[in-house]
Curated annotation (Swiss-Prot):
GO cellular component: cytoplasm; ribonucleoprotein complex; ribosome
Assigned protein family: Belongs to the bacterial ribosomal protein bL36 family.
The name this protein goes by in its record: Large ribosomal subunit protein bL36
Species in which this protein is naturally found: Psychrobacter cryohalolentis (strain ATCC BAA-1226 / DSM 17306 / VKM B-2378 / K5)
Disulfide-linked positions: none
Key word Heme present: no
The entry's keywords: Ribonucleoprotein, Ribosomal protein
Any one of the GO BP annotations: translation
GO molecular function annotations of the record: structural constituent of ribosome
Length: 38
């Protein structure tokens, strides 16, 4: 999980999810694409 100030989709499988006021990127195809804003 990368924690970054600015998160963006890396591939077509990445999805933007809001959890507890934070923005997360989840990816089913490539788990290394997981990110959290903050």
């Amino acid at each position: 999980m990368k924690v970054q100030a600015s998160v963006k989709k890396i591939c077509g499988s990445c999805k933007v999810v809001r959890r507890k006021g934070r923005v997360h990127i989840i990816c089913t195809a490539e788990p290394r694409h997981k990110q959290r804003q903050g």
